[in-house]
Amino acid sequence: MMILGNLRVATLSDGYGLIPDAAILIEGGRIQWVGPEAHLPPSAAPRHDMGGRLCTPALIDCHTHAVFAGTRAAEFEMRLKGASYAEVAAAGGGIVSTVTATRAASADELLAASLPRIDAMLAGGVGTVEIKSGYGLDIETELRMLRVARRIGELRKVRVRTSFLGAHAVPPDYRGRPDAYLAEVVLPALKVAQDEGLVDAVDGFCEGIAFSPAQIAHLFAQAHKLRLPVKLHAEQLSNLGGAALAARHDALSADHLEYLDAEGVAALAAAGTVAVLLPGAFYALRETQAPPVAALRAAGVPMAVATDLNPGTSPLGALGLAMNMACTLFRLTPEEALAGTTIHAARALGLSDTGRIAPGFRADLAIWEAEHPAELSWRIGPAPLHARLHEGEFV
């Protein structure tokens, strides 16, 4: 048991939910009480004076591809010199290069490559991170990626949620045969992953260059049979009705959404599905059509913000910078950006015990060298993190 005193607490209970001169009572890894310190119930718990600093829930990065091998720096240079997508692919670049490197990496090598990325996230105030598979595209490597993700959660003071993304792309050995790939690789791998307790949700990529709505619907039906929630990469490059499809399947989230239309917005609102905005990919791909934030806001769709950390289209590992990008590029307010990396990000992962500072919630907290929550989205550069607590313990 302990008390954090002399804080400015953003509870995220109503907007920022800001409480000046606040205290938090923590016991058993959970928040027992929060409010003005003058009203703190009598307690013999040791008190830590936090010097008037800002306290928020630890941040949640709800969409990452943080486990992979290799880099895509060479094709980054190629694109800047004018190479087309086809030319990059012909030179061995694109997702195939990451798949090749990831398949060749052992579990230990994948872990060694991934831990520094996770450590950088934690230094930015992240306390929960989602990690997807999707760079194996064969049964063995997809499972290896998920095992490495679980191992990260054991080695670091971070809560890891895994998403099975076997339906990320059709590998070269199944080119032109996506249905066979789903039947022979994706669904068998999913069953093994579920049997081993490796998967928390099932994801897919609904796009002309990936999988059709009918194929995703089949995948989701199988996921539901395994009692697994679903989420979807949707409307990133075109509109195939992926968001509405996700909503029909009670998806936790639909992610990207640059080409989301009014029908999709209405479907997300009706289903309570979270819209996950990924400004890093929008920036890296130099897209020009942004997600319809005003329409999502008007419809009451909860909006989350994540890094989409991946080697090809969003090599962004700083959630604070993603918050700034969401405000600058997508016109979110700083309040929306903070909610998008706390309470709404938790909802996008199906978590109901984190993302707010309230009695009964996990004591996953971030203490910042800041006076006001808007500073977290305003800053560009190193995160002003002073300290982080994971289940009520300083880390």
From Swiss-Prot:
Lineage of the organism: Bacteria, Pseudomonadati, Pseudomonadota, Alphaproteobacteria, Rhodobacterales
Residues annotated to bind 4-imidazolone-5-propanoate: 72, 135, 168, 236, 313
Family statement drawn from the similarity comment of this UniProt entry: Belongs to the metallo-dependent hydrolases superfamily. HutI family.
Location relative to the cell: Cytoplasm
Enzyme Commission number: 3.5.2.7
Cofactor descriptive note: Binds 1 zinc or iron ion per subunit.
Function: Catalyzes the hydrolytic cleavage of the carbon-nitrogen bond in imidazolone-5-propanoate to yield N-formimidoyl-L-glutamate. It is the third step in the universal histidine degradation pathway.
GO CC annotations, alphabetized: cytoplasm
Gene Ontology biological process terms in this record: L-histidine catabolic process to glutamate and formamide; L-histidine catabolic process to glutamate and formate
PANTHER family in alphabetical order: IMIDAZOLONEPROPIONASE, IMIDAZOLONEPROPIONASE-RELATED
Protein's name in the database: Imidazolonepropionase
GO molecular function annotations of the record: imidazolonepropionase activity; iron ion binding; zinc ion binding
Pfam families (alphabetical): Amidohydro_1
HAMAP family, per database record: HutI
Catalytic reactions of this protein: 4-imidazolone-5-propanoate + H2O = N-formimidoyl-L-glutamate
